Amino acid sequence: MSQKFDVIVIGAGPGGYVAAIKSAQLGLKTALIEKYKGKEGKTALGGTCLNVGCIPSKALLDSSYKFHEAHESFKLHGISTGEVAIDVPTMIARKDQIVRNLTGGVASLIKANGVTLFEGHGKLLAGKKVEVTAADGSSQVLDTENVILASGSKPVEIPPAPVDQDVIVDSTGALDFQNVPGKLGVIGAGVIGLELGSVWARLGAEVTVLEAMDKFLPAVDEQVAKEAQKILTKQGLKILLGARVTGTEVKNKQVTVKFVDAEGEKSQAFDKLIVAVGRRPVTTDLLAADSGVTLDERGFIYVDDYCATSVPGVYAIGDVVRGAMLAHKASEEGVVVAERIAGHKAQMNYDLIPAVIYTHPEIAGVGKTEQALKAEGVAINVGVFPFAASGRAMAANDTAGFVKVIADAKTDRVLGVHVIGPSAAELVQQGAIAMEFGTSAEDLGMMVFAHPALSEALHEAALAVSGHAIHVANRKK
C-alpha cells in the first residue's frame, strides 16, 4: 500500500524546499523528493542556488574581491601587507564548506518541520500519483492530493562549444578551477558570465567576454548598463558585443574559439572557456505522458497567475515556469502555492521582483526601467544621485556608480529604482519595499535616513526627482 500525503514537492531547490516547509507549517502532511548528489556523493538539498549557483559564486566573488582589495586598495588605508598571493585550492575549499553548511542547514529545517524526505528521482504519473526512483533503481509510488513541481533548471549547451568540464566548462565547472587561468574566455555577457568573469579577472586572468547580442545587459536600465560596461571594462573585462561563436577546437589543454563579429571571422585562444548563455528548465522525464500537464515549445510548464497547471491540484514553480529564473522568485512562489493549497488567498506581485548582478560594483533594479516606461508612453521624472557625492562611500573608497529613482510625472508614484554601486542589492530592496506600499518620491524624500550611510543616496535620488537634492547640483526640470 503506497504512502499518502497532502502535498508532494518534486525538487528541493529554493522553490521546492521552501514550499515543503511552508506546507508543513500550515498543517499539511508533506513529502519532498530530491535526487541531486553533492561532491561527497550524498543527497544535497538546496538545488542549483545553494550547491552550484548563487551561494558558491558569491563565496568566490567575496574571496576574489578581498584579494583585489589587498593587492590594490590596502595601501590607500596605510596598510602594508608585503607580497599578496592567492591560494586557489584553499579558496575553493572555503566555498565548498559554505555550501556544506547551508545544505546541511536546509536538511535540518526539513527534518525539524516534519517533512518526509525521499532521495531519488520524482516523476508525476496520472491521477496525481508520484513515482520515486532511488539511485539503486528501486521505485515506489506515492499518493497525494497536491503536487508541486519544482525541478529547476540547468545550463544551456550550445553546439559550437561542447562542454567537457575541463577546458570548456559551464557555470558549475567554473566554480572549481584549481588555478587561475592565464587567458579566460566567457561566452555570454549575462549575470553568470559577468560574475564568474569578474572572479577570475580579479585574481589575474585576462578575461574576454563574447556576447552575441549587440546591446550590453538589455534588460537593465540603459543608464545603469552603460555605466556598468564602462566600469567593468576598466576593471579588465574585454567585452565584445555582436560576437557570435561559431566553433571551438581543444588542443593541448587550450581552446581556440572561432567567432563572427561586424568585422568578419575571427579566432582567439584561451586556457579555459566558460559557456554561460543561459539556463533551460529541467522537465525531461519529470512527467509521464498521461500526467496531463502541458509544456510549451521550450519545455516550460504552463501555469496560471497562481502557478496552477492544467491539472487540478498540480502546481509548478521556479525555473520550470514563466518569468525570471531567480531563487527568490521561486521561493515566494513556493510560499504562495502552499498558502493556496491550505485554503488561503495568497498572491504574488510579479512587478516587484528585485534583480541583482553581484559584480563590483553591484548592479540591481526593481520595477520598470526608464526605456521601458518611455516605450509605454508614460511621462516620468527621474532623480539620480552619484556615490561620488556620498560621504559614506568616500570613507569606504567605493564611489563608483549611482542610485536612480523613476517616478510617474503625474502622481509622483515611484515606478522603478535602479542602482549600480556599493551594496546595491541591499539598497534596491528599500526601493522595493517603498514601491510595494505605493510610495511617492516625495514620501521617500521626507523620510529620515541615517547619516552617514549608503542609503542616503536613495534619499537624495528621491529628492532629485523633483529637483530638490541637497548634496548634488540639481538638473533643471
UniProtKB/Swiss-Prot annotation:
SUPFAM superfamilies: FAD/NAD(P)-binding domain, FAD/NAD-linked reductases, dimerisation (C-terminal) domain
Catalytic residue positions: H451
Residues binding FAD, per UniProt: 34-49, 58, 122, 319, 327
GO MF term set: dihydrolipoyl dehydrogenase (NADH) activity; flavin adenine dinucleotide binding
Pfam families per record: Pyr_redox_2, Pyr_redox_dim
Full protein name: Dihydrolipoyl dehydrogenase
GO annotation, cellular component aspect: cytoplasm
PROSITE patterns: PYRIDINE_REDOX_1
Annotated residues for binding of NAD(+): G188, A189, G190, V191, I192, E211, V245, A276, V277, G278, R279
Family classification: Belongs to the class-I pyridine nucleotide-disulfide oxidoreductase family.
Biological-process GO terms, alphabetical: 2-oxoglutarate metabolic process
Catalytic reaction(s) noted: N(6)-[(R)-dihydrolipoyl]-L-lysyl-[protein] + NAD(+) = N(6)-[(R)-lipoyl]-L-lysyl-[protein] + NADH + H(+)
